[in-house]
Amino acid sequence: MILRKGRAAAMPFIMLATVIDMMSIGLIIPVLPALVGEFTGSQADQAFWYGVMTFAFGLANFLASPILGALSDAHGRRPVLLLGFCGMAVSFLATVVATALWMLVAVRLVSGAMQANMSVGNAYVADITPPDGRAKRFGMLGAMFGLGFILGPVVGGLLGAIDLRLPFLAAGSLALLNLLYGYFVLPESLPAERRRAFHWKAANPVSSLRGLAQLKGARPLVAVIACTGLAQFVLYTCWVLYTTFKFGWGPLENGWSLAAVGIVSVIVQGLLLGRLLRWFSPRRLAVLGLVSSTLAYAMWGAASQGWMMFAVIFANLLGATVAASVHSIISSAADARSQGQALGAVGGLNSLMAVLAPAIGAPLLAAVSHLPPGDWRIGAPFYFCAVLQAAALVLAVGQFRRERARRGAAGGRNSK
């Protein structure tokens, strides 16, 4: 049982951890390409090695998410969370003193693996929250995700202007502070009687995804997560290049637009989600969010003026509710002893989408880059994302209708 003091500290710790996790990623976005450039002799080599590091981070995150989730089911959430922050601190601080490309690749592998511990943070929230309150709590985490996404690139750009390695020093220091805070304050959320033995089969990313798909009613939702995650990461891959080519935006405009995405996430998931859940169930909210996101991606692709990109960002409020709603449904489908494995598999699936997105989005944009900026086909990556969101919508609606039909049939049998 979590002590009152520990219970009060638990959710703020996880929220702070999420902010730091996103800030640590955002801090290095403006400076990592330039840091890689210090070790390469040409722009082509710089682009290649930056791609290698992006792939290494995503691959390590994909492989580590189910392992850390299964470890947390066996040994508790607290030690795995603290291990993750320790590893993150080491990887960031090691970057400060890196003197060769292979060292940068190595620390990105470690960083990707250790940042997979945020799936354990989701499991921690599921442990301490009743099922009917999880969507709101996951929404709060989403708001912290957005806040970190606002602060990270801004702070990273300012620090990087002083020294390219200074953002890594700042990120490592934040991770160390969170490690110390968690060590002295954070209680364990998973009692011994709810733990289960660690098995490598459960920690295998492919097996964990298969196990996730076997949860009652979850298989279509796995496809929903894959589609929405891939669309999101394709957007992140193409946004800057797309807006630069189509509207002539520079770093300032792109920085403000990405900050706007984070602001919407904070407003919706931190302030509005709780109110929305009073009116709509997580399933209904997920459907409304997918409708909104489908339209938003299509409008981003068709936008003819830069201000339209901002207008759609702020119009797509419901789109920011999808992840929290679906995570809540997945969490409710898993039993109390499998939260870490289930949510670790969700994290691993998102990491896999992050690996695939550059290989899909960049070639799509390159294929239409010869067209004049006013040509509607320039928005091809965003139209692709709209199709992904529409597919997710069809899958979700079909699954929720089947659930209602089963409940109706069960109610009919019970009334006889």
Residue ranges and their predicted role:
Residues 76, 97-102, 114, 248, ...:
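Helix-breaking motifs and short loop linkers at transmembrane-helix boundaries and internal kinks
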Residues 31-47, 237-254:
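Short amphipathic helix-loop junctions that connect adjacent transmembrane helices
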Residues 160-173, 365-389:
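A membrane-interface helix-boundary motif in multi-pass transporters
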